[in-house]
Curated annotation (Swiss-Prot):
Homology family: Belongs to the class II aldolase/RraA-like family.
GO MF annotation list: 4-hydroxy-4-methyl-2-oxoglutarate aldolase activity; metal ion binding; oxaloacetate decarboxylase activity; ribonuclease inhibitor activity
UniProt name for this protein: Putative 4-hydroxy-4-methyl-2-oxoglutarate aldolase
Quaternary structure note: Homotrimer.
C-alpha cells in the first residue's frame, strides 16, 4: 500500500493535477489511497457498486457518481469488505455511505459526502466506465486519482510522491 500526501503531489505536479471541490470526508480505514480510475454512474441504486466490488481491483479506485444524493447510501460494510478483499485501493463516492464504524476499520480508502442509514434500491441501473463530472472535475476511466485527509486530486497519468 502506497502512502500519498495530496499537498505534496499538488506542489510537485501543479500543471497536471485537478483538485476536487472540498466536499468529501474520509471514512475508510486507509488515510490515503490512489490508483487508476474506474468510473460508475448510478443514482440511489448500488447494484453496480456491488458488482464492481466483486471484481479484482488491485491498483484501482472506483469513482462513483451518485448524483450527490443525500437520501440513500451507495456503500455499506459488506460491499466495502468485499472491495478490500478483492484488492481495491478505494472508492470516491459522490453520494453517501453507511456502516461507517465498520468501514473505518476496513483496509480500504473511502471518501464520500456523508453517512446515511438507508440502503438503496437494487434495480441494476447504472453505467460503467463512462466519463463523469462532479466536484468541479471530469473523471475519465484510465486516469488517476489520489486522496487523503487534505483532499482529492485527479491526474491524466500516474504520479509518484516527491523525494
Amino acid at each position: 500500500m502506497n502512502h500519498y500526501v495530496t499537498p505534496d503531489l499538488c506542489d510537485a505536479y501543479p500543471d497536471l493535477v485537478q483538485v476536487l471541490e472540498p466536499m468529501f470526508s474520509n471514512f475508510g480505514g486507509r488515510d490515503s489511497f490512489g490508483g487508476e480510475i474506474v468510473t460508475l454512474k448510478c443514482f440511489e441504486d448500488n447494484s453496480l457498486v456491488k458488482e464492481q466490488a466483486d471484481q479484482p481491483g488491485a491498483g484501482k479506485v472506483l469513482v462513483v457518481d451518485g448524483g450527490g444524493s443525500l437520501r440513500r447510501a451507495l456503500l455499506g460494510d459488506m460491499i466495502a469488505e468485499k472491495a478490500a478483499k478483492n484488492g481495491w485501493e478505494g472508492l470516491v463516492i459522490y453520494g453517501c455511505i453507511r456502516d461507517v464504524d465498520v468501514i473505518a476499520q476496513t483496509d480500504l480508502g473511502v471518501q464520500a459526502l456523508a453517512s446515511h442509514p438507508m440502503k438503496t434500491d437494487k434495480r441494476g441501473i447504472g453505467d460503467l466506465n463512462v466519463v463523469v463530472t462532479f466536484a468541479g472535475v471530469t473523471f475519465r476511466p484510465g486516469e488517476y486519482i489520489y486522496a487523503d485527509n487534505n483532499g482529492v486530486i485527479v491526474s491524466p497519468s500516474p504520479l509518484k510522491m516527491p523525494e
